[in-house]
Design a protein with these regions (language model features):
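Short, solvent-exposed beta-strand-terminating loops
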Residues: 11-40, 172-180
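Substrate-binding cleft and catalytic face of glycoside hydrolase catalytic domains
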Residues: 70-183
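Active-site-adjacent substrate/metal-binding segments within catalytic domains
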Residues: 22-107
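Short, small-residue-biased leader/transition segments that mark boundaries at the very start
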Residues: 1-4
Length: 183
Protein backbone atom coordinates (compact mmCIF):
# COMPACT_ATOMS: atom_id res chain seq x y z
CA UNK A 1 0.00 0.00 0.00
CA UNK A 2 1.12 3.54 -0.71
CA UNK A 3 0.57 4.62 2.88
CA UNK A 4 3.68 2.70 3.99
CA UNK A 5 5.82 4.48 1.40
CA UNK A 6 5.02 7.96 2.70
CA UNK A 7 8.03 9.78 4.16
CA UNK A 8 5.97 11.00 7.12
CA UNK A 9 4.56 7.58 8.03
CA UNK A 10 6.24 6.03 11.05
CA UNK A 11 6.27 2.28 10.51
CA UNK A 12 7.38 0.57 13.69
CA UNK A 13 6.56 -0.81 17.07
CA UNK A 14 6.81 -0.11 20.77
CA UNK A 15 8.09 -1.69 23.94
CA UNK A 16 9.07 -0.43 27.36
CA UNK A 17 12.19 -1.16 29.37
CA UNK A 18 10.16 -2.64 32.20
CA UNK A 19 8.34 -4.98 29.83
CA UNK A 20 11.24 -6.41 27.86
CA UNK A 21 14.70 -5.87 29.32
CA UNK A 22 14.91 -8.29 32.21
CA UNK A 23 18.37 -8.04 33.81
CA UNK A 24 16.72 -6.26 36.69
CA UNK A 25 19.84 -5.97 38.83
CA UNK A 26 22.66 -6.11 36.28
CA UNK A 27 25.27 -3.46 35.64
CA UNK A 28 24.37 -1.37 38.66
CA UNK A 29 20.63 -1.07 37.98
CA UNK A 30 18.47 -0.48 41.04
CA UNK A 31 15.02 -1.90 41.67
CA UNK A 32 12.10 -0.01 40.19
CA UNK A 33 8.42 -0.07 40.97
CA UNK A 34 7.82 -2.25 37.91
CA UNK A 35 10.36 -4.78 39.11
CA UNK A 36 8.47 -5.40 42.33
CA UNK A 37 4.86 -5.45 41.13
CA UNK A 38 3.52 -8.98 40.78
CA UNK A 39 3.16 -10.13 37.17
CA UNK A 40 0.02 -8.69 35.59
CA UNK A 41 -1.16 -7.07 38.80
CA UNK A 42 -1.57 -3.42 39.70
CA UNK A 43 -1.86 -2.44 43.30
CA UNK A 44 0.21 -1.34 46.23
CA UNK A 45 3.93 -1.29 45.54
CA UNK A 46 5.87 -3.00 48.29
CA UNK A 47 9.59 -3.36 48.77
CA UNK A 48 10.98 -6.73 47.77
CA UNK A 49 14.42 -8.25 47.68
CA UNK A 50 16.24 -10.12 44.92
CA UNK A 51 15.06 -13.71 44.79
CA UNK A 52 11.42 -12.87 45.60
CA UNK A 53 9.14 -14.77 43.25
CA UNK A 54 7.30 -11.53 42.44
CA UNK A 55 10.28 -9.80 40.82
CA UNK A 56 10.21 -9.64 37.03
CA UNK A 57 13.74 -10.75 36.31
CA UNK A 58 13.95 -12.08 32.76
CA UNK A 59 11.18 -10.70 30.50
CA UNK A 60 12.31 -11.40 26.92
CA UNK A 61 15.95 -10.69 27.84
CA UNK A 62 16.10 -7.66 25.56
CA UNK A 63 18.98 -6.36 27.69
CA UNK A 64 21.20 -9.11 26.31
CA UNK A 65 19.50 -9.73 22.94
CA UNK A 66 18.64 -6.23 21.72
CA UNK A 67 20.98 -6.41 18.71
CA UNK A 68 19.13 -9.47 17.40
CA UNK A 69 15.78 -7.82 18.09
CA UNK A 70 16.75 -4.57 16.37
CA UNK A 71 17.97 -6.56 13.34
CA UNK A 72 14.56 -8.29 13.19
CA UNK A 73 12.83 -4.91 13.38
CA UNK A 74 14.97 -3.72 10.48
CA UNK A 75 14.00 -6.85 8.51
CA UNK A 76 10.37 -5.86 9.02
CA UNK A 77 11.14 -2.42 7.63
CA UNK A 78 10.67 -0.46 10.86
CA UNK A 79 11.52 3.21 10.58
CA UNK A 80 10.81 3.96 14.26
CA UNK A 81 11.08 2.08 17.54
CA UNK A 82 9.41 3.45 20.64
CA UNK A 83 11.01 2.28 23.85
CA UNK A 84 11.73 3.65 27.28
CA UNK A 85 14.70 4.13 29.53
CA UNK A 86 14.62 2.48 32.93
CA UNK A 87 15.24 5.43 35.26
CA UNK A 88 16.75 3.02 37.79
CA UNK A 89 19.36 1.94 35.22
CA UNK A 90 20.71 5.47 35.03
CA UNK A 91 20.06 6.43 38.65
CA UNK A 92 19.68 3.24 40.73
CA UNK A 93 18.25 5.11 43.73
CA UNK A 94 16.87 8.03 41.73
CA UNK A 95 18.41 10.78 43.85
CA UNK A 96 22.11 10.42 42.91
CA UNK A 97 23.95 13.31 41.31
CA UNK A 98 26.01 11.20 38.89
CA UNK A 99 24.47 8.61 36.56
CA UNK A 100 25.47 4.97 36.43
CA UNK A 101 27.97 4.79 33.51
CA UNK A 102 26.92 1.22 32.67
CA UNK A 103 23.31 2.32 32.28
CA UNK A 104 24.35 5.16 29.99
CA UNK A 105 26.52 2.74 27.96
CA UNK A 106 23.65 0.27 27.50
CA UNK A 107 21.18 2.81 26.17
CA UNK A 108 23.83 4.51 24.02
CA UNK A 109 24.60 1.14 22.43
CA UNK A 110 20.88 0.42 21.97
CA UNK A 111 20.25 3.75 20.23
CA UNK A 112 23.38 3.39 18.09
CA UNK A 113 22.15 -0.05 17.02
CA UNK A 114 18.82 1.46 16.00
CA UNK A 115 20.56 4.17 13.96
CA UNK A 116 22.84 1.57 12.33
CA UNK A 117 19.69 -0.10 10.98
CA UNK A 118 17.98 3.14 9.93
CA UNK A 119 15.52 3.03 12.83
CA UNK A 120 14.68 6.24 14.67
CA UNK A 121 14.37 5.71 18.43
CA UNK A 122 11.38 7.41 20.05
CA UNK A 123 12.03 7.34 23.78
CA UNK A 124 9.69 7.54 26.77
CA UNK A 125 11.37 8.75 29.94
CA UNK A 126 8.92 7.29 32.43
CA UNK A 127 6.86 4.23 31.51
CA UNK A 128 5.18 3.40 34.83
CA UNK A 129 8.47 2.85 36.63
CA UNK A 130 10.50 4.89 39.06
CA UNK A 131 13.40 3.81 41.25
CA UNK A 132 12.04 1.96 44.27
CA UNK A 133 14.13 4.09 46.62
CA UNK A 134 12.15 7.18 45.56
CA UNK A 135 8.94 5.41 46.56
CA UNK A 136 10.20 4.19 49.91
CA UNK A 137 12.14 7.32 50.90
CA UNK A 138 10.07 10.13 49.36
CA UNK A 139 6.63 8.70 48.61
CA UNK A 140 7.15 8.86 44.83
CA UNK A 141 5.04 11.39 42.90
CA UNK A 142 3.19 12.52 46.02
CA UNK A 143 6.36 14.40 46.94
CA UNK A 144 7.28 17.59 45.04
CA UNK A 145 10.98 16.62 45.26
CA UNK A 146 10.20 14.13 42.49
CA UNK A 147 10.01 17.02 40.05
CA UNK A 148 13.67 17.84 40.70
CA UNK A 149 14.73 14.19 40.56
CA UNK A 150 12.87 13.70 37.28
CA UNK A 151 14.26 16.94 35.80
CA UNK A 152 17.81 15.85 36.64
CA UNK A 153 17.17 12.44 35.09
CA UNK A 154 15.64 13.97 31.95
CA UNK A 155 18.50 16.47 31.48
CA UNK A 156 20.98 13.63 31.88
CA UNK A 157 19.20 11.65 29.15
CA UNK A 158 19.06 14.63 26.78
CA UNK A 159 22.78 15.26 27.21
CA UNK A 160 23.93 11.62 27.18
CA UNK A 161 21.94 10.69 24.07
CA UNK A 162 22.17 13.96 22.17
CA UNK A 163 22.38 13.19 18.46
CA UNK A 164 21.00 9.69 18.95
CA UNK A 165 17.44 10.42 20.12
CA UNK A 166 15.41 13.00 18.27
CA UNK A 167 11.97 12.34 19.76
CA UNK A 168 11.23 12.22 23.49
CA UNK A 169 8.05 11.52 25.46
CA UNK A 170 7.85 12.36 29.14
CA UNK A 171 5.25 9.94 30.54
CA UNK A 172 3.41 6.94 29.19
CA UNK A 173 -0.36 7.12 29.72
CA UNK A 174 -0.14 10.13 31.99
CA UNK A 175 -3.87 9.86 32.70
CA UNK A 176 -3.10 6.94 35.04
CA UNK A 177 -0.81 8.99 37.28
CA UNK A 178 -3.68 10.14 39.47
CA UNK A 179 -3.83 6.77 41.20
CA UNK A 180 -1.74 6.48 44.37
CA UNK A 181 -1.27 2.80 43.58
CA UNK A 182 0.31 3.57 40.19
CA UNK A 183 3.72 4.20 41.77
Amino acid sequence: SDVYKRQDFLWGGATAANQVEGAYLEDGKGLSTSDVQPHGVFGEVVERVPGDSGIKDVAIDFYHRYKEDIALMAEMGFSVFRTSIAWSSLFPRGDEQQPNPQGIAFYRSLFEECKKHGIEPLVTLCHFDVPMHLVMEYGSWRNRKMVDFFSHYARTCFEAFDGLVKYWLTFNEQNLYHSPEAF
